[in-house]
């Protein structure tokens, strides 16, 4: 990137890097550390015209969610509906919605965005304590 005159480095973090989730505390800690790493990299690399950001998705309709439900839910459809209800939009995100944030951050339109974490979580992180039913 230095030889090319700059660029955009985008790390995949997670909303769990901002929130406490029982049972996945180590995962959340690593994502929080990644957010901090990106901020430091952004400062270090700014003079080289390299922007560094993170994207923090919430729950996404993805193979990761499907594996989680298959491993932990007795009624997968009911569990999926419960995940949807955790989000103010009433549904989990899509892979395409998360990818669109990456495309934007890599674009010239995001030329002044660095050392920033963008949550793509459908409002999940804004709810505070999550409902269980």
What are these regions (language model features)?
Residues 10, 52-55, 65, 115:
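Hydrophobic structural elements of the Rossmann-like NAD(P)H-binding subdomain
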Residues 14:
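Residue(s) in the substrate-gating loop at a strand-loop-helix junction
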Residues 19, 103, 114-133:
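Short C-terminal tail/terminal secondary-structure segment
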Residues 20-24, 29, 46, 129:
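Active-site "substrate specificity/gating" loop of NAD(P)-dependent dehydrogenases
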Residues 30, 38:
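Active-site helix of classical SDR
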Residues 43-47, 111:
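Alpha-helical segment proximal to the catalytic Tyr-Lys
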Residues 47, 59-86, 127-133:
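A glycine/serine/threonine-rich, flexible loop-to-helix segment
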Residues 54, 62, 77-109, 113, ...:
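C-terminal helical subdomain
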């Amino acid at each position: 990137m230095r030889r090319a005159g700059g660029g955009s480095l985008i790390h995949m973090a997670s909303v769990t890097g901002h929130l406490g989730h029982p049972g996945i505390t180590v995962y959340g800690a690593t994502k929080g550390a990644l957010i901090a790493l990106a901020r430091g990299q952004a400062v270090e690399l700014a003079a080289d015209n390299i922007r560094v950001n993170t994207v923090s998705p919430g729950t996404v309709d993805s193979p990761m969610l499907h594996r989680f439900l298959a491993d932990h839910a007795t009624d997968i459809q009911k569990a999926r509906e419960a995940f949807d209800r955790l989000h103010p939009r009433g549904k989990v995100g899509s892979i395409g919605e998360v990818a669109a944030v990456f495309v934007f951050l890599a674009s010239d339109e995001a030329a002044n965005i660095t050392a920033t974490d963008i949550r793509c979580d459908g409002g999940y992180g804004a709810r505070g304590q999550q409902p269980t039913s």
